Amino acid sequence: MIHLENIHKTYRGGNDLHVLKGINLDIAKGEFVSIMGASGSGKSTLLNILGILDDYDEGVYTLDGTLIRGLSEVRAADFRNRMIGFIFQSFNLIPFKDAMENVALPLFYQGVPRRKRNALALEYLDKLD
């Protein structure tokens, strides 16, 4: 589902900073992945690229067989809404909703009926135990 091949990212400025150097990664549908590393090692940059929030300089990124490069904002938002989810180390839940409602919220925006989204949210919460 997610395929990265030889991904490079450099932040240009007074001193160029080459933060991703030849990253290769494959993530299957439904697979849970943890990205860990020291401060400044490129984790946030990698997540921004995976989440289609930032572009890469070199390499190939495909999501469900579609090349992720130069997408319109509308198409990128559609991919993020339907295909990508993150759980951050320090995350913020919507305080007036319980855990199940927080997990189900993206499904609401996708138009999934309430019973189905609640069942899916509970299923995924059970996987976290």
Regions found by a protein language model. Name each.
Residues T66-L67, F108, R115-D129:
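Conserved ABC ATPase "signature" region
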